[in-house]
Amino acid sequence: MGIFQLLRDRRISSRGPGLHTPKAEPRRRKGLTTGLMTQAERQKQAHQRQAAMRETALWCTGHIRPRTHTHTGTHTQTDRERERNTQRLRDRERRENGRHTHTYTHRHTHRVL
């Protein structure tokens, strides 16, 4: 068996430590249909890899915090909460308390000790 026959055999990589060490399984990163990927898909994958690498670099240098707090904004109001916060109720309170109590303009009082 000549060297070119070995190279032509798909299971054996020409870039290994030696030509005569066949790979047990040609391991692929993602997806078993990499041969059937379109150029656009390949470019998208490459772009995602690049972005991930950039993000990892930023994370390592402490520029971005990891997104661990992902459970925000998932609170659903109960019926009681909902009816307590209806617009009609707030309007009534506003009428009783005087106008513009919903704005934060005159909350701070200046006191000299």
Swiss-Prot record:
Composition-biased stretches (Basic residues): 100-113
Pfam hit, one: FAM27
Region named Disordered: 1-113
InterPro entries attached to this UniProt entry: FAM27D/FAM27E
Biased composition (Basic and acidic residues): 77-99
Annotated family: Belongs to the FAM27 family.
Protein name: Protein FAM27E3
